Amino acid sequence: MDTLAPESTRQNLRSQRLNLLTNEPHQRLESLVKSKEPFASRDNFARFVAAQYLFQHDLEPLYRNEALARLFPGLASRARDDAARADLADLGHPVPEGDQSVREADLSLAEALGWLFVSEGSKLGAAFLFKKAAALELDENFGARHLAEPEGGRAQGWKSFVAILDGIELNEEEERLAAKGASDAFNRFGDLLERTFA
């Protein structure tokens, strides 16, 4: 993996290290999403949104965590659980009941950073998904709110997030936990996707 990024990037940017360390679960999840054909029909898309809702439901306590909010100003406004819930209502799909395994987990700050890294990073890929949703006549006002471009733009939102993420001081063990949190987040979404498409 060391050949995939310049040495200075690997050493200095946590966001780049996390990208490298989570490449396998990320690629596995992308393949799983494609296999479910979420844009084949509105019903399939609703199942995809249900997984998105459950994932955002998992993350809701992190987006409203006071310690994290001190690090990331306006963090609560980045949450998408309400948008996904509204999309499910638009699509006539019941709101699934999430389990409490992640919400009640005793995540360290470093692990939480990994989970947020995955959630915030997914907003970049959501641009492609949002365009695909248009073929189902869904948009930021109906059915695809959670994929819509955030206020201020996707690129700027991500840039501001990683600028803070990359600047937080973590020791070696905390770096490991951040990577674990990110991998766990990718795997969790895969599990939720399997559940909603079962």
Swiss-Prot record:
TM regions (residue ranges): none
Factors inducing expression: Increased transcription under iron starvation.
Annotated heme b binding sites: 26
Signal peptide feature range: none
Gene deletion effect: Mutants are unable to use heme as a source of iron.
Protein EC: 1.14.99.58
Keyword Oxidoreductase: yes
Keyword Cytoplasm (UniProt): no
GO biological process: cellular response to iron ion; heme oxidation
Function: Involved in heme degradation. Catalyzes the degradation of heme to biliverdin, with the release of iron. Forms biliverdin delta (70%) and beta (30%). Under anaerobic conditions ferredoxin--NADP(+) reductase (fpr) can provide the necessary electrons; Bfd is not required.
Similarity section: Belongs to the heme oxygenase family.
Phenotype when changing residue 19 to K: No change in regioselectivity of the reaction. Changes regioselectivity and forms biliverdin alpha (55%), biliverdin delta (35%) and biliverdin beta (10%)
InterPro entries, sorted: Haem_Oase-like (IPR016053), Haem_Oase-like_multi-hlx (IPR016084)
Protein name, UniProt field: Heme oxygenase PigA
CDD domains recorded: HemeO-like (cd00232)
Reactions accelerated catalytically: heme b + 3 AH2 + 3 O2 + 2 H(+) = biliverdin IXbeta + CO + Fe(2+) + 3 A + 3 H2O; heme b + 3 AH2 + 3 O2 + 3 H(+) = biliverdin IXdelta + CO + Fe(2+) + 3 A + 3 H2O
Disulfide bonds listed in the record: none
Pfam entry (one): Heme_oxygenase
